[in-house]
Regions:
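Short aromatic/basic micro-patch
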Residues: 112, 141, 178-179
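Short, well-ordered alpha-helical scaffold segment located
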Residues: 112, 146-149, 184
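Short, surface-exposed amphipathic charged segments that create phosphate/polyanion-binding patches used
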Residues: 87-90, 144, 183-187
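Flexible, gly/pro- and Lys/Arg-enriched active-site loops
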Residues: 119-162
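Residues that scaffold the ATP/ADP-binding catalytic core of kinase and kinase-like folds
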Residues: 21, 116, 149-150, 188
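Nucleotide and nucleotide-moiety/phosphate-recognizing core
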Residues: 3-106, 111-130, 136, 167-172
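Conserved alpha/beta core of the MobA/IspD/sugar-nucleotide pyrophosphorylase nucleotidyltransferase superfamily
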Residues: 2-9, 152-199
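Glycine- and other small-residue-rich loops at beta-strand/loop junctions that grip anionic moieties
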Residues: 106, 139, 177
Length: 199
């Protein structure tokens, strides 16, 4: 990871869940001949962002072996949930790269954001997230102040109970896509067909 680029937000992709309801790893869903995780990495790299992927030990090898332009690390306790996974990534960045940085958090199962939304998040300094029709979505930009709050919290506490992002309205038609079922996977494929300009 390039320290010089840490003036830009660092992206943390959360991909440590076991996808029990879907029955297959969300990161390894195949989209146009590539894993979903690779599609998201490519999308973020277009903005010249550094990327850190947090995953579990079972998915580490397939993700690490197939994903370029990103660092991959293991969350040893993925059962603690997303906040715990995020803490693993934030501590890794603080310990190895910078004590003061912003980060864009991208859950693997919420890929329906546009390039315009990423550009907007990059331009902001306070903790912020997109919304569509008044409902909040992902990714979330975390300020350095809120990163400290998250690191001090218990790992099983939902992020919404720790921070309060400022929201901005976007036109992302698939912002609220949440990959959890086979029907959601069909919507994901529709998204990649209809919004090719975002990839």
């Amino acid at each position: 990871m390039n320290n010089a680029k840490l003036q830009l937000p660092v992206c943390i992709i959360l991909a440590a869940g076991y996808s029990k309801r879907l029955g297959q790893p969300k990161a390894l869903l195949e989209i146009k001949g590539e894993y979903l995780i690779n599609n998201i990495v490519k999308k973020l790299r277009k903005h010249d962002l550094e990327i850190l992927i947090i995953t579990n030990k079972e998915l580490f090898d397939p993700i690490n072996n197939s994903t370029k332009d990103a660092e991959v690390i293991i969350n040893p306790r993925p059962e603690m949930g997303r906040t715990g996974s995020l803490q693993v990534g934030l501590r890794h960045l603080k310990d190895n790269f910078s004590k003061n940085f912003k980060t864009i958090v991208v859950p693997i199962d919420r890929p329906g954001f546009s390039n315009a939304t990423i550009s907007k998040l990059i331009s902001l300094n306070s903790t912020s997230s997109p919304m569509k029709n008044g409902k909040g979505g992902h990714p979330i930009l975390l300020s350095a102040v809120d990163i400290s709050k998250i690191l001090c919290a218990e790992p099983n506490i939902p992020l919404r109970d720790i921070i309060a992002p400022t929201r901005f309205e976007v036109n992302d038609n698939y912002l609220h896509l949440n990959i959890d079922t086979e029907d959601d996977v069909k919507l994901l494929l529709d998204y990649y067909i209809q919004d090719e300009s975002n990839f």
